Amino acid sequence: MKIMKIFRHLIAAGCLIWVASTEAQSWVTPALPAIPDRVYPIADFGAIGDGVTTNTAAIQAAIDAAAGAGGGTLEVPAGVFLSGPLRMASQIRLRVDGTLRMLPLGQYPGGTTDPANFISGANLHDIALSGSGSIDGQGAPWWPYAKTRGAKRPRMISFSSCERVLIEGLLLTNSPMFHIAISGRTCDVTVRGVTIRANASTDPVNPSHNTDACDVTGKRILIQDCDISVGDDNYTCGGGTSDVLITNCTYGYGHGVSIGSPTSGGISNFTVIHCTFNNTDSGIRIKSDRDRGGLLQRLSYRDLCMTNVGCPILIYAAYMATNREYRALNSLTPAIAATYPRREVTEKTPIYRDILFSNVTAMAQPGRRAGLIWGLPEMAVTNVLLQQVTLTADKSLGIYYAQNVRMVDSHIRTPTGVNPLDSTHAQVLVTPP
C-alpha cells in the first residue's frame, strides 16, 4: 500500500541540530607533504624529452637517487618524456613542467595482460606531483578493452595507504583507466588546481569507460579548484572515508560526484560546496547495495549549480540489482519500487542518514527526472533536508522508502506543476520559507 505523509508546518529548531553539526565540520585542511629542497633534474640521469626515447630507467634512477639521499624534487622540464611504469618513494616531489607521457599500448610493459600502474606507491609518506605541465596517458587505444573479458588497463596515478599526498597544478589527460586512484589507509590528501580530461562515455567515436577522475578513499581529503570532464565518476570514494571537502570545482562529462558503491566501513563528514556541473550524467550520486554497505552520515551538498545533467540528485541502495525494472532508475515508479524484496538487516546493510542539500539549482536533461531518493524496505533513508533547492525536470522527484525527508523553501518544477512527488513508503515534510 502506498504510504505518503505530507506535513505543512514549520520544522522545530531541534530537528536541525544535525544540519548545524554538518556545517560546522565542513572545512578540511589536510597536512601537506614535507619535502627537502634538493633538486634532481631528470636530464642529469639521461632522460631525453624528444617524444621518442623511452625514459623509464632514467626517471626511476632519479627517483631512487633522491630517495636514497632523503628526498627531494625531480624536475621534468619542457619537452615530451616517454616512460613506462614508475615507482614513487617517500619525500619525493615529481615536478612536471613539460609532458610526461605513458608509453603507448603496443610498448607498455604487461600490455592488457598485467600492466603496472604508471605512477604508483604504497605505504609512503610526503609525496607530491605538481607543476605547470601535463601527464598524458595515451589512453584511446586502451579504452575499447573495457569490453574485453579479462583485459586489464593501468591507472595513471595510484597510491595506497600513504600519508600526506599533494597533486597540484597539472593537466592529466586520457588515462587508460582511472586518472587518480588513492585507497587503503590513506590520510591527508590534497588535489588542487588540477585539470583532468578524457572522452565522455557517450562519445560516438571512442568512448572512454572507467576513466574516473579522482577515486580517493581515506581521511582528510581536499579536492579544490579542479576542472574535470571524463568518462566515469568525476569523484568517488569507498568505505572508510571521512572528512572530505570538495570545493570550487567545475565538472563536465562524467558520472558526477559519487559515493560508493562499496561503503563498508562507513563514510562521514563529506561536503561538496561551490561547484558547477555541466552535462554530467548525474550531479550528486550516492550508491551502495546489500552486502557492501556501511553507515553513511553527515553528507552536505551546498551552493551547487547544475545545467543539463542526467539526474541532479540520485540516492539509492540497489546499485547491484539484477532485475531490469529496478535498474531503470529514470522510469522507476512507486509501484515498481514497492515490489523491491525485503531482506534481513545485517552488518553490511547500507544505512543513509543526515543528508543536506542547500542552495542547489539544477536543470535536468530532457526526459529525465528531477532526482531519486530510494532506500531499502528494511532500511529507509532518513533525515534528508532540501533547503532552497530548485530542480527543473520533465519527470518528478521519486522518494521511496525514506523517512523524515524535509523540503524547506524548495521547488520541484515539472510540466505537470510544482512539487509533484512520486513516493511510496515515504514520509515527506514540505514547509514554506
Where are these regions (language model features)?
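Bacterial N-terminal signal peptides that target proteins for export
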Residues: 2-11
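Repetitive helical segments and hydrophobic/amphipathic motifs
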Residues: 14-17
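N-terminal signal peptide c-region/cleavage motif recognized by signal peptidases
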Residues: 19-21
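Extracellular/periplasmic carbohydrate-active domains that bind, remodel
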Residues: 24-433
